[in-house]
UniProtKB/Swiss-Prot annotation:
Cytoplasmic-facing ranges: 665-1342
Protein name (record): Receptor tyrosine-protein kinase erbB-3
Gene it is expressed from: ERBB3
Residues with PTM Phosphoserine: 686, 982
Subunit structure: Monomer and homodimer. Heterodimer with each of the other ERBB receptors (Potential). Interacts with CSPG5, PA2G4, GRB7, MYOC and MUC1. Found in a ternary complex with NRG1 and ITGAV:ITGB3 or ITGA6:ITGB4.
Reaction(s) this enzyme catalyzes, per UniProt: L-tyrosyl-[protein] + ATP = O-phospho-L-tyrosyl-[protein] + ADP + H(+)
Family statement drawn from the similarity comment of this UniProt entry: Belongs to the protein kinase superfamily. Tyr protein kinase family. EGF receptor subfamily.
Cellular component GO terms, alphabetical: basal plasma membrane; receptor complex
Topology term for the membrane: Single-pass type I membrane protein
Biased composition (Low complexity): 1175-1187
Biased segments, Basic and acidic residues type: 1097-1110
Signal peptide range in chain numbering: 1-19
């Protein structure tokens, strides 16, 4: 580092030697564009940074600091005040980035397409070296782009910065995450906003503290402390010279919107003239001259001219000027010294857009006809047109072969010069020979052959060359330079009329017509000879200069009988077409044209002459006086103060009357529209039956005409069609009703929707509070289904946007309402097929409705085929039988319902995120299911798991799901645990209220439809107190650690459910007395003895607030018959019994548990108990929990036979509510001991709080739970299986194979299946759903 110190000292001395240059102007340095790519090691990278940015103030480009070591001294960066591009800091090891003076990052270039500041991976995994602090204390403006700061293990105080005060673009993305954790707090004077822990590290706020009158930054909170509009990054005063940085350009310390222009308006000459004080834009600075390696393009300094301009030198200034056509392009020719000997198909494309040929052009027979020896194909004659752009050939032109159908060389019609710097053979610069079909030369623009001889011979059809005066073309002596022979004789050409046009002069011509003349006899216009110009008539009017016709200026008025102009300028017109400004004809008078002292404004008088406005007019005028100024208040002269006051009062009265009348008219129209909307939305139509014997159905839907519907915009698209937002304009009405229009098309084209089918009428007859009612349908080539427009959108978007404002009460009620809506569809025989959170809409924040039901049945069967390649196919929501066999039933909808509830409980997470659609069925076959959401207890999660059972017959029905979620919704904190995270300085408060009634009214307004859907309370007769109370229920939340969260995979969205080892280790730790929480995976199979864990968990969901006594579920294998199992078998009834167990109402009589929209209220009795508020189990009497022997005999359980046993003694009352908590079901531990046990163990109930008011009809929790040990326990009890010696269940013996059966065991329905083979697949045939292969051939049914 001594060498580095020496270099820094030398650099400092050099900077001091520059003296005033550094002090009086900004030190500008170039940036880099390397990204994360670097050359050399860290030492080389440091030296490069030092050379680029030492004493630099403005970085013209990007500031990239990558792979710099921990001992690098970066103090030389402290002078940087502005970066025009982006700032990249990545993979460094230094502790502090010293940019204390950086104020503005302009973001003219952004990293990764969207970030102006990108800071990432600044740490060393093998040491403690890492970036710990960004010293950007003066940064107050990012003009374009966002911020990305991630994965910096030691970087602190990034989340204490108000980035919205710095970033100008409100839509810019700001990502700040995964940085330092153990950081000191901000100093108290910083008020929570700082770059570091010291008092000098406070963030400077320049936007959020400003008064509303300020458009941008400010230097104080008062209205008179706003910064100038051209300021960026703050200011110290209101002037444009007080800015810390400029928004656009800095002109000698003043911030201006543009630099002084190169042309200004001269009021004396009425012309734009060069500005002696012009400056050019160089980055964000106005400079008097561009750097030597830049060129001037209009008002800017650029590195190179754009494609349509060329670089020229004017008075020592390099400038870009328009090319006036093709820009000059030089191309290499053919012949000696070149890579090519002739023009052929291999090099013809290299002459595109060439204006100058450096060398020669040879056209030989091997080029046109091809060269088989070199495998060069024949040349396409049409490609010879590329030479239309050639103006000069520096060498010679040699044409010895030409396409037979081309009779001239008009492809060289723009050729003006043949240089002759290199000559062919005996000194020829133009050689044309043996072209048998050529009749004329066609070199109409050729003016000069600088050197060399001309050889034209053996062209049997060539004429017109006899007339040429070659002395006008050849430069220098002409003696012995012409060798023209053996062409067509002159007399033959004259005899056939192949002579020059009469308009040609005596100089001759290159071919027929007035456009081939070497010179004209009279006038020429655009290279064509004419008899006269359009002096007095014709369009456009012209003047002549050196016998060539030119058009007058467009602003000249065409004259009759006299000349319109005498030159090309606007000051040469005899009369102006529009206005005259001084001597010049203009299209309009100057309006805001920049002059030497500011903008110039003029107005036209009666003669259309432009006259200057009054000097105080700033926005134009219509006359010369002050009162003629535009945008200014007229001064009333001669009016008394009394008259003025009366006029003002009268005007105010008229205005108020007009406003009052307008309001009353608007209110009347509003009420009228509201009533009309209700009439149309609530009224149905009766469809007459086709068969007179049938009874007419009340169909709520209408049959629309296409003229009544108007689509406004596309809301989205799905598997079966596209959804539009639109309006319904009833025929004969003027109201516009907002609706959703779903367009369904048959992609195969085999079906049209001209006829109204029974299924369409069935959909239209459905009406329920929790389904979106079909307003009508419009048949045609594509079917249009019309529903009411719900502006709150889908439930999926709502939970994602308001996840911090959703409580357990609302989530569980949504589950109830979706289940009720689906149960209504089930009662009416309607299978949804596409149930998901995106297809559930919000009518209000407390009421949801199921949408898009019955759509799939409108399409032909082939259109319902599922393709994994289709991204819109809802594979992740579909049941396995639907994926594999296309089987859709109400029970397949139950599977989708479970996924939908999972979406709600994860606040809109994507199921199976990161998996391709084709991988999902294989994953489900292996027994994997979606992971338990963090907010769900095992009760809620097991309801989801039951919805995902492979056998559709043992899934719950929607009626049972509605009852189950209704029961949970009466005590929400018991089943959902939502943690409220508090930010810095924010205390945790009660559950947010969501959208207020006022916001709901604003959401329902449709300004583009001129429609207001809200009326006063006496018009609506709808109370809004229900919604308010539902959203403002004070629900307690639990902040408890969850021991099972280590198994969740947030990246993938599902939980692996076959981790048997975890369960075994958990059991071992439980037996050994450890209270440490173990993860408990949920696996459907494989499990011991061929039993599915999902089967063993059927019916084992906690069903009431008083469930305390646990039942250990014994899993067993069940062989099924080949036919589908009826819904009335024992297992099914046992499951239904557990789900339909009535809940004893605890609320006082007379209190409603649901509102008019089906919103379930929390049980007031439960909410009155402390345990309920804390989310623990309800306190009940012990006798109520244990029950009596008679009650035990009447209870029926699934997959187990329970013996009667005596009630254990009363447990002690817990000392505090902290001893109570949620418990997870242990389904991952080894069950082999319990399955083979013949003894019983007493079940130890969790300590409870007695409550004499609880009824004894309570369900049970199916959990394996042990009494806590003496050590400190966690919030969740460790639930391991009971030892084999203590199981309280009957002996369950394994089924032996043939010849090994126990004599006393008989099974009437037992059918032995074949053993499992390696080639078997779970879905080889549809019979899989009604049978199962056991791992062992001698497995016994239990």
């Amino acid at each position: 580092m001594r060498a580095n110190d020496a270099l820094q000292v030398l650099g400092l001395l050099f900077s001091l030697a520059r003296g005033s240059e550094v002090g009086n102007s900004q030190a500008v340095c170039p940036g880099t564009l390397n990204g994360l790519s670097v050359t050399g090691d860290a030492e080389n990278q440091y030296q490069t940074l030092y050379k680029l940015y030492e004493r630099c103030e403005v970085v013209m480009g990007n500031l990239e600091i990558v792979l710099t070591g921990h001992n690098a001294d970066l103090s030389f960066l402290q002078w940087i005040r502005e970066v025009t591009g982006y700032v990249l800091v990545a993979m460094n090891e230094f502790s502090t980035l010293p940019l204390p003076n950086l104020r503005v990052v302009r973001g003219t270039q952004v990293y990764d397409g969207k970030f102006a500041i990108f800071v990432m991976l600044n740490y060393n995994t093998n040491s403690s070296h890492a970036l710990r602090q960004l010293r950007l204390t003066q940064l107050t403006e990012i003009l374009s782009g966002g911020v990305y700061i991630e994965k910096n293990d030691k970087l602190c105080h990034m989340d204490t910065i108000d980035w919205r005060d710095i970033v100008r673009d409100r839509d810019a993305e700001i990502v700040v995450k995964d940085n330092g954790k153990s950081c000191p707090p901000c100093h108290e004077v910083c008020k929570g906003r700082c770059w570091g822990s010291g008092p000098e590290d406070c963030q400077t706020l320049t936007k959020t503290i400003c008064a509303p009158q300020c458009n941008g930054h400010c230097f104080g909170p008062n209205p008179n402390q706003c910064c100038h509009d051209e300021c960026a990054g703050g200011c110290s005063g209101p002037q444009d010279t007080d800015c810390f940085a400029c928004r656009h350009f800095n002109d000698s310390g003043a911030c201006v919107p543009r630099c002084p222009q190169p042309l200004v308006y001269n009021k004396l000459t009425f012309q734009l003239e060069p500005n002696p004080h012009t400056k050019y834009q160089y980055g964000g600075v106005c400079v008097a001259s561009c750097p030597h390696n830049f060129v001037v393009d209009q008002t800017s300094c650029v590195r190179a001219c754009p494609p349509d301009k060329m670089e020229v030198d004017k008075n020592g200034l390099k400038m870009c000027e328009p090319c006036g056509g093709l820009c000059p392009k030089a191309c290499e020719g053919t012949g000696s010294g070149s890579r090519f000997q002739t023009v052929d198909s291999s090099n013809i494309d290299g002459f595109v857009n060439c204006t100058k040929i450096l060398g020669n052009l040879d056209f030989l027979i091997t080029g046109l006809n091809g060269d088989p020896w070199h495998k060069i194909p024949a040349l396409d004659p049409e490609k010879l047109n590329v030479f239309q752009t050639v103006r000069e050939i520096t060498g010679y032109l040699n044409i010895q072969s030409w396409p037979p159908h081309m009779h001239n060389f008009s492809v060289f019609s723009n050729l003006t010069t043949i240089g002759g710097r290199s000559l062919y053979n005996r000194g020829f610069s133009l050689l044309i020979m043996k072209n048998l079909n050529v009749t004329s030369l066609g070199f109409r623009s050729l003016k000069e052959i600088s050197a060399g001889r001309i050889y034209i011979s053996a062209n049997r059809q060539l004429c017109y060359h006899h007339s040429l005066n070659w002395t006008k073309v050849l430069r220098g002596p002409t003696e012995e330079r012409l060798d023209i022979k053996h062409n067509r004789p002159r007399r033959d050409c004259v005899a056939e009329g192949k002579v020059c046009d009469p308009l040609c002069s005596s100089g001759g011509c290159w071919g027929p017509g007035p456009g081939q003349c070497l010179s004209c006899r009279n006038y020429s216009r655009g290279g064509v000879c004419v008899t006269h110009c359009n002096f007095l008539n014709g369009e456009p009017r012209e003047f002549a200069h050196e016998a060539e016709c030119f058009s007058c200026h467009p602003e000249c008025q065409p004259m009759e009988g006299t000349a319109t102009c005498n030159g090309s300028g606007s000051d040469t017109c005899a009369q102006c077409a529009h206005f005259r400004d001084g001597p010049h004809c203009v299209s309009s008078c100057p309006h805001g044209v920049l002059g030497a002292k500011g903008p110039i404004y003029k107005y036209p008088d009666v003669q259309n002459e432009c006259r200057p406005c009054h000097e105080n007019c700033t926005q134009g005028c219509k006359g010369p006086e002050l009162q003629d100024c535009l945008g200014q208040t007229l001064v009333l002269i001669g009016k008394t103060h009394l008259t003025m006051a009366l006029t003002v009062i009268a005007g105010l009265v008229v205005i108020f009357m007009m406003l009052g009348g307008t309001f009353l008219y608007w209110r009347g129209r509003r009420i009228q529209n509201k009533r009309a909307m209700r009439r149309y939305l609530e009224r149905g139509e009766s469809i007459e039956p086709l068969d007179p014997s049938e009874k007419a159905n009340k169909v709520l839907a209408r049959i629309f005409k296409e003229t009544e519907l108007k689509k406004l915009k596309v809301l989205g698209s799905g598997v079966f069609g596209t959804v539009h937002k639109g309006v319904w304009i009833p025929e004969g009405e003027s109201i516009k009703i907002p609706v959703c229009i779903k367009v369904i098309e048959d992609k195969s084209g085999r079906q049209s929707f001209q006829a109204v089918t029974d299924h369409m009428l069935a959909i239209g007859s459905l009406d329920h509070a929790h389904i979106v009612r079909l307003l009508g349908l419009c048949p045609g080539s594509s079917l249009q289904l019309v529903t009411q427009y719900l502006p709150l959108g889908s439930l999926l978007d709502h939970v994602r946007q308001h996840r911090g404002a959703l409580g357990p009460q609302l989530l569980l009620n949504w589950g109830v309402q979706i289940a009720k809506g689906m149960y209504y569809l089930e009662e009416h025989g309607m299978v949804h097929r596409n149930l998901a959170a995106r297809n559930v809409l919000l009518k209000s924040p407390s009421q949801v409705q199921v949408a898009d039901f019955g759509v799939a049945d409108l399409l032909p069967p082939d259109d319902k085929q599922l393709l994994y390649s289709e991204a819109k196919t809802p594979i992740k929501w579909m049941a396995l039988e639907s994926i594999h066999f296309g089987k859709y039933t109400h029970q397949s909808d139950v599977w989708s319902y479970g996924v939908t509830v999972w979406e709600l409980m994860t606040f809109g997470a994507e199921p199976y995120a990161g998996l391709r659609l084709a991988e999902v069925p294989d994953l489900l076959e292996k027994g994997e299911r979606l992971a338990q959401p963090q907010i769900c207890t095992i009760d809620v999660y097991m309801v989801m798991v039951k919805c995902w059972m492979i056998d559709e017959n043992i899934r719950p029905t929607f009626k049972e799901l509605a009852n189950e979620f209704t029961r949970m919704a009466r005590d929400p904190p018991r089943y959902l645990v939502i943690k409220r995270e508090s930010g810095p300085g924010i205390a945790p408060g009660p559950e947010p209220h969501g959208l207020t009634n006022k916001k709901l009214e604003e959401v329902e307004l449709e300004p583009e439809l001129d429609l207001d859907l809200d009326l006063e309370a006496e018009e609506d007769n709808l109370a809004t107190t229900t919604l308010g109370s539902a959203l403002s229920l004070p629900v307690g939340t639990l902040n408890r650690p969850r021991g099972s969260q280590s198994l969740l995979s947030p990246s993938s969205g599902y939980m692996p459910m076959n981790q048997g080892n975890l369960g075994e280790s958990c059991q071992e730790s439980t037996v050994s007395g450890s209270n440490e929480q173990c993860p408990r995976p949920v696996s459907l199979y494989p499990m011991p003895r061929g039993c599915l864990a999902s089967e063993s968990s059927e019916g084992h969901v906690t069903h009431s607030e008083a469930e305390l006594q646990e039942k250990v579920s014994m899993c067993r294998s069940r062989s099924r018959s080949r036919s589908p199992r009826p819904r009335g078998d024992s297992a099914y009834h046992s499951q239904r019994h557990s789900l339909l167990t009535p809940v004893t109402p605890l609320s006082p009589p007379g209190l409603e548990e649901e509102d008019v929209n089906g919103y379930v209220m929390p049980d007031t009795h439960l909410k009155g108990t402390p345990s309920s508020r804390e989310g623990t189990l309800s306190s009940v009497g012990l006798s109520s929990v244990l029950g009596t022997e008679e009650e035990d005999e009447d209870e029926e359980y699934e997959y187990m036979n329970r013996r009667r046993r005596h009630s254990p003694p009363h447990p002690p009352r817990p000392s505090s509510l902290e001893e109570l908590g949620y418990e997870y079901m242990d389904v991952g531990s080894d069950l082999s001991a319990s399955l083979g046990s013949t003894q019983s163990c007493p079940l130890h109930p969790v300590p409870i709080m007695p409550n004499a008011g609880t009824t004894p009809d309570e369900d049970y929790e199916y959990m394996n739970r042990q009494r806590g040990g003496g050590g400190p326990g966690g919030d969740y009890a460790a639930m391991g299986a009971c030892p084999a010696s203590e199981q309280g269940y009957e002996e369950m013996r394994a089924f032996q194979g043939p010849g090994h059966q126990a004599p006393h065991v008989h099974y009437a329905r037992l059918k032995t299946l074949r053993s499992l083979e390696a080639t078997d697949s779970a879905f080889d045939n549809p019979d899989y759903w009604h049978s199962r292969l056991f791992p062992k051939a001698n497995a016994q049914r239990t």
